[in-house]
Amino acid sequence: TLAALGGAIYAGPVKKAAEFEAQMSTVKAISNASADDMKRLSEEAKHMGATTKFTAVEAGKALEYMAMAGWKTDQMLGGLPGIMNLAAASGEDLGQVSDIVTDALTAFNMTADQSGRFADVLAQASSNANTNVSMMGATFQKVAPVAGALGYSVEDMSLGIGLMAN
């Protein structure tokens, strides 16, 4: 009936708004961000949801992984575009890509402001080898802590992983 159709039309946006609020509550709980910082993070997630192929909820999930890595608000805001570009280019899940990038940056003693560089290196390596971002991320998970401690660069490791994948 018309009432049921109207309810269904109204329920969709309400559910999405509730999902977004729940996701951002998770970010707040992990990051312990102030109300002002949460406003900035929420606005950026909504902006990314409106201007990229990803939803605001997915952008919030990426922020969650950044918060788990100990990134502060400005680091999250600075790192989000590069991570989103890598996820878009690879066609992979944004949250998973954020997890890969934040974990690898930590292992290589790189800072959040280097996430764009790391994302570019990973995108290039995965597109030039018989691998993808997820497989490279799984490999980085195993080798990055040792490689980083030994002073190897992300570029060296990406090249090595790409060669082994071929």
Q: Which residue ranges define each predicted feature?
A:
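Small-residue helix-packing and pore-constriction motifs in hydrophobic alpha-helices
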Residues: 2-50, 61-69, 76-90, 96-129, ...
